[in-house]
Swiss-Prot record:
The gene is rsmA. Its EC number is 2.1.1.182. Keywords: Cytoplasm, Methyltransferase, RNA-binding, rRNA processing, S-adenosyl-L-methionine, Transferase. It is an enzyme of class 2 (transferase). This is Ribosomal RNA small subunit methyltransferase A. Gene3D superfamilies: Ribosomal RNA adenine dimethylase-like, domain 2 (1.10.8.100), Vaccinia Virus protein VP39 (3.40.50.150). SUPFAM superfamilies: S-adenosyl-L-methionine-dependent methyltransferases. Its main location: cytoplasm. S-adenosyl-L-methionine binds at N31, L33, G58, E79, D111, N136. It is found in: Cytoplasm. Belongs to the class I-like SAM-binding methyltransferase superfamily. rRNA adenine N(6)-methyltransferase family. RsmA subfamily. It holds the Pfam family RrnaAD. The keyword RNA-binding applies. NCBIfam families: ksgA (TIGR00755).
Amino acid sequence: MSNSMPIASPVRTQAIVNRYFMHAKKNLGQNFLVDLPAIKGIVEAADIQPGDQVIEIGPGIGSLTEQLLLAGAKVLAYEVDQDLPEILNNELPQKIDGEELKDRFKLVMKDVLKANFVEDNDGFLDLSKSVKIVANLPYYITTPIIFNLIKSDLDFSSLTLMMQKEVAERLVAKPKTKEYGPLSIAVQSRMNVRLAEEVKSTSFMPRPKVDSAVVVLTPLLEKPDINDYAFFDHVVKMCFAQRRKTLANNLKTLIKDKDEREKLINDLGLDVRVRPEELTLNQFVQLAHLLKDRQA
């Protein structure tokens, strides 16, 4: 099979699977992306430019990695599947823009949730400068990875992540929609979020049961007035404990007295019958402040 054909093509992917007697591992959430326009869409969404430093999570057989390298990026990749280093080293282009593969690509065999980026990098990328993070995330571990990266000390300019469409819709959801909830608020209180593209299940091998979407997260220029994120997240979760109930009803666990709960809601300029999904991010921030002041 000629390596002039992109890894992302169905023919080349199938040839790689056959050559290495491999299969997609369900326990690792593996589905190989075989849609070159979709992969180029990820690269475009991440705004990859020559010389960019990229951390890739879960390179798989290299479908996305190859396009990142061809776009001019230097890539540090995290992978847990021990069967993949041989495939990546053999199948990725051995020369990119006149440079050896080893000078443009480094593979770290480790769960990214256990990453020590400085030690793992070992001078490969210049971590004194910003990096871009790109990933085709396993569905089962999407949320932990997002929050692990947000809370890390890593200086990144963007996270461009492919994930289950349903999760993507929750990340970008607005108030008064059924997708809006604690995950929407937790992420939007920390990052700008936008939906870049949708990817059909037919773009994968084997075909998953659900469609995917690409989301781009970038640091907020102006962060909300939240001093204690752990408390803020707890308040939001309590407010959505019973989604169909009113905010006043859900606040029972935090404030026993009915009159006091209703006064608190009125102090926010809201009707006592308001439901949690009707509150904006700023109103949740104000609510958390009122509850924190009440504890003081």
